[in-house]
Amino acid sequence: MSINKVHISIAVLFIFYVVGLVGITSDHSDFFLSLTPLNLLLTLAILLVNHSDWNRVWWIFPLTAFAGLVVEIIGVNTGFPFGQYEYGWVLGPKILNTSVVIGVNWLILLYATNSMTKPLSIKSPFIRAAISALMMVFLDFLISASLCIVNGRN
């Protein structure tokens, strides 16, 4: 078996995530949590290096990240459409009370959920988008529930 860029990418992410997981459960958790923006940027870089269909959809990547950031800026500052919430220090620098890398997070998650629906052989892009959206909502529910538990909210 020959080693290719996908194998190397998986190994890099695996090592980075394991070190991060161990780090955030250690006495140095604040330091490791402060690396979250780097984690997102590394994940994005690996995603972009491994993406192969650049001719058709390259412009969707920056548009998705920007749209995600704009939606979050609106949400954080108005409470619409997600309700009242705020970002702490973990995601790094902010613009208009919103972590700059949140758009990158949206891009990564949308790319991942779209990739997971491709093997389903669903021809309708609307149904695939709906399934991807449901996956995102489920993930958000899991993240929000765990954050409420960590922060002591019900």
Regions found by a protein language model. Give the residues of each.
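Aromatic-rich, lipid-facing transmembrane alpha helices and their immediate juxtamembrane interface loops
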Residues: M1-N154
